Every structure is written in C-alpha cells, then in structure tokens.
Amino acid sequence: MSVLTFLKPRGSSSVARERLQLILAHERAERSETGRPDLIITLREEILNVIAKHVTVERDKVQIKLERGEGVSTLGVDIEFPVDAISKAKPKAKRAIA
Amino acid sequence: MSVLTFLKPRGSSSVARERLQLILAHERAERSETGRPDLIITLREEILNVIAKHVTVERDKVQIKLERGEGVSTLGVDIEFPVDAISKAKPKAKRAIA
C-alpha cells in the first residue's frame, strides 16, 4: 500500500464533508514468533471503535485496506463524513503514554 | 509533516526490536466551526491508550508529532519496542464499524 496514494487529497467538490485518514504500519523484527496474533489486526477494531465514538460514520463511507508484507503489516483507513458528524462532547481520556 | 519522512524504514541494526508507526490526518471542511475541539487531539489520547493496552511501551521510545495546517491536522506517532513487548492475550473487541 503506497502511503501517498492513500493520503491523496480529495477533490474540492465536497465542501461540507470532512475526511479522516489513518495509516498504521507495524515493522516486525526478523525473529518475531509466527504464531503471535498480528498486532495490526488486534489494534484495528479498537482504533475503529475509538473513531466511531467521536464521529458518526456511514458504513459505505469507510475504506479499510490491510496489507501484510515481508516484514511490515500496514493498515489504511479512509473515512469521509459530513461536518456535523463529529460529536461535540470533549471526553476526558486517562493518559497511558505521556 | 511529510508522510514519507515519517514512515522512513528503520536501519537494520535493531533486529530484535519492532516499530509501530501511525499517521492520522484530518481534512477539515472549509466551514467547520472554529470553536469545535480538534478531532485529532480528541482521538490522540484514546488511540495511544489502545496501543498501550497491547504493547508495553517505554516512554522514551515514543515520538509524537502534531501539526495543524490550513485545512489539515496531522498526528504522527512512532513507537519502537522489543519483540516481547506485545501482549499475547487476544482481546475480543466489539465492532462499531463493520
């Protein structure tokens, strides 16, 4: 998945729509155990759940690409949504990584 | 933040270390309300919390870049970690976006 094709700017037609794009790349070590669950797949659901808490997402406006290469797994998510789809509430999140 | 410089491949020196890189770009609509909290900042903490649930992260191995441009806000996260830092448990996550 070429990063650039994924993050290509949108046409200016949809003025009242916004776009969220996410790329998650996991570069694995040579001797990482093959049996271990793929980190990207583990993270994908929970990250999508975080996004869905803050943005009302229409299923057909979500593109998800997952690629597992030689030493790298890559997840690409592209979500388009109307301006008012973002929830106003400012949630308080405990910080795990400072 | 140029996507390419962020996702540049690591040197092959650290064979037993892995790397997780995330880029989150939010393309805002021209008339989105200025008073609204920045979506990227809202999502940043919760996504980092999701990652920290599955990877034991050393604080000094986490790089976070946040850029707010004309119509786009971009978050870049780069985490390096040892092979055994990934938790083995395979959590069951409810799916919000299919």
Swiss-Prot record, chains A, B:
UniProt KW keywords: Cell cycle, Cell division
Superkingdom of this protein's organism: Bacteria
SUPFAM superfamilies per the UniProt record, alphabetical: Cell division protein MinE topological specificity domain
InterPro entries in UniProt: MinE, MinE_sf
Transmembrane segments: none
Gene3D superfamilies to which the protein is assigned, alphabetical: Cell division topological specificity factor MinE
GO biological process: cell division; regulation of division septum assembly
Role this protein plays: Prevents the cell division inhibition by proteins MinC and MinD at internal division sites while permitting inhibition at polar sites. This ensures cell division at the proper site by restricting the formation of a division septum at the midpoint of the long axis of the cell.
Protein family according to the UniProt entry: Belongs to the MinE family.
Protein name per the record: Cell division topological specificity factor
Species whose genome carries this gene: Methylorubrum populi (strain ATCC BAA-705 / NCIMB 13946 / BJ001) (Methylobacterium populi)
